[in-house]
């Protein structure tokens, strides 16, 4: 169980980290709190992630449009106002965008799969 007291934070005060993709660049602003990683991520035009991600996320598209491609070949177009969720170790995925996008991404231990003999 997580205990997170009420708090605010200003994204404009959080430094952007640059993460080059196969093409384009992503810029991450990260806020950590009690086992959660909350990120505001901006994808540049023509961005393609440089790896298949196996981490779980809750993703919300704040601006623009991007494609979430699964390692199986399935592709999902997410536009402003759309979300997806996936647990750790399921559905390896990567992102791409032609025109850029801004996302809110939340991940942490709560997205780890529960084993059959463990209580939920």
Model-derived features with residue positions:
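Short, conserved beta-strand element in jelly-roll/cupin
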Residues: 52-68
């Amino acid at each position: 169980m997580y205990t997170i007291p009420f708090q605010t934070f200003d994204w404009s005060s959080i430094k952007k980290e640059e993460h080059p993709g196969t093409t384009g660049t992503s810029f991450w602003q990260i806020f950590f709190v009690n086992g959660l990683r909350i990120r505001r991520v901006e994808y540049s035009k023509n961005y393609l992630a440089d790896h298949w991600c196996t981490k779980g996320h809750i993703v919300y598209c704040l601006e623009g449009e991007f494609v979430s491609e699964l390692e199986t070949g399935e592709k999902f177009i997410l536009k402003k106002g759309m979300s997806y969720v996936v647990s750790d170790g399921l559905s390896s995925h990567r992102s791409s965008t032609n025109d850029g996008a801004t996302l809110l991404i939340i991940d942490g231990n709560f997205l780890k799969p529960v084993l059959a003999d463990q209580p939920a």
